[in-house]
């Protein structure tokens, strides 16, 4: 990937049964640390007590063998997880890691309604957000509204699921006709 110009790598504590971070480290160890951008995520739904924050974060740094994360996300925020994160002071913990230089950009990935997103955006200062954005979810999951909330707040957007896990890569003939009718060019 690096030789083809791809330099942004996204992993998470739980991906591939906890093996993804180590696999990313193995793949990137031959490259200078400043030649790629690494994103990782705090598994919000797993958190039960504040002590877990340091344990998990340090384990991620060790697994990734990276020293710092370029992008770090509160993973899969939705209303319930967001409320619990406030009592655990997750944002404050991660903001401190950012101040220490262990995180360059602090953000979140999101899976809920625009109303919940607005609440999250209004309550903290974010460097970026990651939302599910594709032509199907634009209306169905109100991704357009989410995108507008973030852009109005000057929060950069990272897109996840642009092809919805590959399901949008092959279109049905009827879908092709509809898209062509909407924009023949």
What are the residue ranges of the model-derived segments?
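Short, acidic/polar
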Residues: 1, 49-65, 111-121
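A structural motif
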Residues: 6, 66-69, 103, 126
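Acidic-and-aromatic substrate-binding clefts and catalytic sites of carbohydrate-active enzymes
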Residues: 12-21, 45-51, 80-83, 114, ...
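A short, structured active-site edge motif that brings together acidic residues
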Residues: 34-46, 72-77
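Active-site groove signature of glycoside hydrolases
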Residues: 61-82
